[in-house]
Swiss-Prot record:
Provenance organism: Rattus norvegicus
Function: Catalyzes the electroneutral exchange or flux of physiologically important metabolites such as dicarboxylates (malonate, malate, succinate), inorganic sulfur-containing anions, and phosphate, across mitochondrial inner membrane. Plays an important role in gluconeogenesis, fatty acid metabolism, urea synthesis, and sulfur metabolism, particularly in liver, by supplying the substrates for the different metabolic processes. Regulates fatty acid release from adipocytes, and contributes to systemic insulin sensitivity.
UniProt tissue specificity: Expressed most strongly in liver, then kidney, and at lower levels in heart and brain.
Gene3D superfamilies xref list: Mitochondrial carrier domain
Name of the protein in question: Mitochondrial dicarboxylate carrier
Transmembrane intervals: 9-29, 62-81, 102-122, 162-181, 202-222, 254-274
Pfam family, one: Mito_carr
Subcellular location: Mitochondrion inner membrane
Gene symbol of the encoding locus: Slc25a10
InterPro entries: Mit_carrier, Mito_Metabolite_Transporter, Mitochondrial_sb/sol_carrier, Mt_carrier_dom_sf
Lineage, top ranks: Eukaryota, Metazoa, Chordata, Craniata, Vertebrata
Length: 286
């Protein structure tokens, strides 16, 4: 009998951490662009300003929080999605229909988004800290220090500021990434022209990254503004209204860097994940 392998529940978190290490500078630039009150700088200009002002390593500000986020948010959503998908297809003759993948992706993303909200809050703050005046900087030493100080100084409730938005975005991103990746890979393999190899993984994940970017950009902007606020927004709706006053384009601030960051991040995540599954996955006789 042929031997196949399935993912272990924590592979998604490990793969996402590997991808985050590669794409963190792009994530940082995306946050800087989204938190501008007016559109003053584009992606290249923002990158040059960060390097000139704080040095090249400033592009990696908040990396510990980003990794902490991946080990909460991404680990949770991948674990739920892949475990449930494998369970639901265990005795079936074919893959899940697309609507089932979308439903699974939505549930997994909602849960992962909520679990990852505290780390996401600290991640956004650490990335944006250098833009603040010296007197207003939070100067978190690392992710755990940030989590501890937010809980101590602002209360445990503040750790989940923007949880609704983060969960909603998590659902959209997970549908765009995991559900669309599975579907794209299934369609590519069904043509018979490509086998289950690295190029297939690259093509499928590239499609998934594009889907995820377009699905979640407006919510991503609102989430970033909510998490970086000092209480000026009363909620998601109020934040949306205030953002709308800046014009429709305000909802798509940082669209290019979001795509430039999310598409490579998605590609790297799934290529790492497929290699982890291939070499270290659970053996299944088929």
């Amino acid at each position: 009998m042929a031997e196949a392998r399935t993912s272990r529940w924590y592979f998604g978190g490990l793969a996402s951490c590997g991808a985050a290490c590669c794409t963190h500078p792009l994530d940082l630039l995306k946050v800087h662009l989204q938190t501008q009150q007016e559109v003053k700088l584009r992606m290249t200009g923002m990158a040059l300003q960060v390097v000139r002002t704080d040095g090249f390593l400033a592009l990696y500000n908040g990396l510990s929080a980003s990794l902490c986020r991946q080990m909460t948010y991404s680990l949770t959503r991948f674990a739920i999605y892949e475990t449930m998908r494998d369970y639901m297809t265990k005795d079936s003759q074919g893959p899940l229909p697309f609507y089932s993948k979308v439903l699974l992706g939505g549930i997994s993303g909602l849960t992962g988004g909520f679990v990852g909200t505290p780390a996401d809050l600290v991640n956004v703050r650490m990335q944006n800290d250098m833009k603040l005046p010296l007197s207003q900087r939070r100067n978190y030493s690392h992710a755990l220090d940030g989590l501890y100080r937010v809980a101590r100084e602002e209360g445990l409730k503040k750790l989940f500021s923007g949880a609704t938005m983060a969960s909603s975005r998590g659902a959209l991103v997970t549908v765009g990434q995991l559900s669309c990746y599975d579907q794209a890979k299934q369609l590519v393999l069904s043509t018979g022209y490509l086998s289950d190899n690295i190029f297939t993984h690259f093509l499928s994940s590239f499609i998934a990254g594009g889907c995820a970017t377009f699905l979640c950009q407006p919510l991503d902007v609102l989430k970033t503004r909510l998490m970086n606020s000092k209480g000026e927004y009363q909620g998601v709706f109020h934040c949306a209204v205030e953002t709308a006053k800046l014009g429709p384009q305000a909802f798509f601030k940082g669209l290019v860097p979001a795509g430039v960051r999310l598409v490579p991040h998605t590609v790297l995540t799934f290529m790492f994940l497929e290699q982890l599954r291939k070499h270290f996955g659970i053996k299944v006789a088929t």
